Amino acid sequence: MQTVTLHNGVEMPTVGFGVFQIPDPENCQQVVEEAIRTGYRLIDTAQAYGNEEAVGQAIRNAGVPREELFITTKLWISDMNYQGAKEAFATSMEKLGLDYLDLYLLHQPVGDTFGAWRALEELYHEGKIRAIGVSNFKPDQIA
């Protein structure tokens, strides 16, 4: 599987399986399990998708060692501030049933992105997240 090396040295698969618009838990779990069985190693979910629990169950059921998977989720705008990001991360981790996250993204450039980013940096430095980033931001919103 092809990977790209992020600035911090983390290897990320270049192809992933996203679960946007799969709200039914049983369906989501089934398709994620099948995606992992067919070779996908990057699974992309988000707090806003409402399916982190199903993704977590699929990860546990798939029979692939956790360290071979790359799991991404995203912070939604309703929690886009320092404290909200910390609490939402803890909730996502509980729903996913993971000890660490490979990539945590700010989902949209709305709200207190600076405060949320500070929280992500702290979680990264605590070893709870391997990499952090942004999603749906334009270049001038990150410069």
Segments the model singles out, each with a brief description of its role:
Residues 13-18, 43, 69-73, 101-106, ...:
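Hydrophobic faces of well-ordered beta-strands that scaffold small-molecule active sites
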Residues 23, 80-143:
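Glycine/proline-rich, positively charged
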Residues 33, 53-57, 73, 87-90, ...:
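N-terminal, well-ordered alpha-helical segments
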Residues 2-7, 14, 72, 88, ...:
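Short, functionally important structural connectors and interaction interfaces within domains
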Residues 1-69:
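N-terminal binding-site loop/beta-alpha segment at the start of enzyme catalytic domains
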Residues 41, 66, 74, 95, ...:
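Basic side chains
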